[in-house]
Amino acid sequence: VYPAGERERLLRITGAADIKDCSQLLLDTACAWKRGTAEQKEALAKRYIALLSHLWEQGWAEGSSLGTTHHLGYAMRGLYPSVLLMRTVLESAGLMKKAADMLAWFSGRGRIFRREVRWESMDTLNTLLQGILYSILLEKDTGKQAAYLHTLRKWLNGILRPAPGLKGPFKVDGSAFHHAGHYPAYAMGGFQGLTPVIYALSGTEFQIDAEAFETVRKSLFMMRIYCNRYDWPVSMSARHP
């Protein structure tokens, strides 16, 4: 955390790169690798591993304390799908476990083991949930993978029931809470992060239960009522519609 008014000067002195830019570059490289020719793939794989290895060397690895002062979900969300796309390259290089452990750490996968949880931040659904799922899918031990998926299902069933008090993400009336109030702008991101995970788990023994699904469904359809193109009171839109 840079002192107020000193950020630009210190960045010039240190030559620091933003982790968000690095994360996006990893994803762009992985997408290009997926579509590339054999020759292009070889070069792109080397670039991907070089950048990821540099991040590890700088401390962006399992066990790091770099993310304890603030939420890193928005800055690092390009990382998670990039590792999934590059899994064969990482496996061949003997780096798969280190990459998977990195995903589990920075996505905060440990949260799914908390018991009797009835709420979760909308930010988690938006920026971390898919990373949690990817880290589980990269688990090579199928027994552990199944156990993690069952735990993920149980956790989702808890947090996707109507949340108590001013907690999020969803309420019994279909409103979507963040920052202790109804906040549609954050809800949109929450749905974008959550619904692909619900879809990925559907039709399997790990799919969410009917009550959790109905809570999400009701909140999504409620948007048709409270969204308005021209007139959104602050009480319905929080800081911005």
Tell where the protein language model's regions lie, with residue ranges.
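Aromatic-lined, polymer-binding surfaces characteristic
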Residues: 1-241
